[in-house]
Regions:
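Sec-dependent N-terminal signal peptides
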Residues: 3-14
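N-terminal hydrophobic targeting signals that begin at the initiator methionine
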Residues: 1-2, 20
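Charge-biased low-complexity segments
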Residues: 19-216
Length: 216
């Protein structure tokens, strides 16, 4: 009888051990660099802080310690608040923008991210003439849901944003060498597969306020 009880206890302990999930891999656990499988190198900053910055090591303007200054094409720097407030623009095709986010995240990931505070912001450097995003920078919440996504994920994300997203900017911005854009994604407004029939109202909301716009 004692042997039976002991065997049962061992079996229960083994079952409990087998059911214990392994902790998610944190690819951004320390400052420095990480590499995607295609060789693209990303700089990581703020690994011990609530927000981690991930940016392509080849970025010139959208770096972890980049200057927020903007410059005219003739080399003069914008000096006044009025000048910076005159710079304006927005993502041209919200459907394309939202489609990328829908493709990059599964429904399960979206549901999990809806419960987190500011899990993802995307900064970019925009060519005012073409509206092309020249550079992309990610600011992720220091959550396992984000830090467990490998460098290849952010590489694919970056490539799609550069290839598929364009900005419309005002005439004042077209006088500049480059400008900065910022998207703070609200996952509660990103539709699940079952909610795709509501995508147009959601897109209108995504284009309001701080979620999509410029930053200086």
């Amino acid at each position: 009888m004692k042997r039976t009880i002991l065997l049962l206890s061992l079996l229960l302990a083994a079952a409990a051990y087998a059911q214990t999930p392994e902790p998610a891999v944190n690819y951004y656990a320390k400052d420095g660099t990480v590499s995607a499988t295609d060789g693209t190198v990303y700089c990581v900053d703020g690994a011990d802080s609530p927000t981690i910055t991930i940016c392509n090591a080849e970025n010139r303007y959208s770096t972890v310690d980049a200057s927020p200054s903007l410059y005219y094409k003739d080399g003069r720097r914008l000096e006044t608040v009025e000048e910076y407030e005159s710079v304006n623009g927005a993502v041209a095709d919200q459907e394309a923008f939202t489609r990328i986010f829908r493709d990059m995240f599964t429904d399960e990931q979206i549901v999990a991210l809806r419960n987190l505070r500011l899990p993802l912001a995307v900064g970019c450097t925009v060519d005012p003439e073409t509206g092309v995003q020249l550079e992309v920078k990610f600011a992720i919440g220091n959550y396992p849901e984000m830090t467990s996504l490998p460098p290849d994920f952010y590489r694919t994300f970056e490539k799609r944003l550069k290839e598929e997203v364009r900005w419309n900017v005002n005439d004042f911005a077209k006088q500049l060498k480059y400008m900065f854009g910022l998207t703070v994604l609200n996952f509660r407004k990103l539709p699940l597969t079952s909610e795709l029939h509501q995508i147009k109202p959601g897109l209108e909301e995504i284009n309001q306020g701080e979620e999509v716009g410029l930053h200086h």
